[in-house]
Amino acid sequence: KKQHLEANIPTRLYCEVEQAQMERAIQNILVNAIRYSPSGELIRISLSETHGTIRGEIENTGVRVPDDAIPHLFEAFYRADTSRNRNTGGTGLGLYIVRKVMEMHRANYGISNINNGVLFWFELPCKQPVDNSI
């Protein structure tokens, strides 16, 4: 689709997670961003850490989610706006899986419309590494 990806990810972040599940969740979010962004649009991904919490944001431009669909996006098999979904594929389980993984990790998460696109965000509480240098 020739979309543009802009990544702002620190070289080192520490957080104990179920790696395979967290990778799947982030992959599902990225797949949705790619799937619902028109060719040539920008997708941004960023991660940051503040006070033991990692905040992740994935933003895509070009297509907004209908406001009445936002509360349902994390439900199993829910797909918003069928006119856009006809050619996109998918089962309606991607964001449901994201929800389950985020809940398992006690993370806050959400989706909101911004300007001319969508922002998915999560805030993941993390244990700090033990300093064994003493």
Feature names for model-found ranges:
Residues 4-14:
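Conserved catalytic submotifs in the C-terminal HATPase_c
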Residues 22-26:
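A residue-level detector for a conserved hydrophobic packing site
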Residues 89, 94, 98:
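Short alpha-helical Gxxx[C/S/T] motif in the catalytic ATP-binding
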Residues 33-34:
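Short helix-loop "hinge" at the ATP-lid/N-box region of the Bergerat-fold HATPase_c
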Residues 106-112:
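Glycine-rich ATP-binding loops of the HATPase_c
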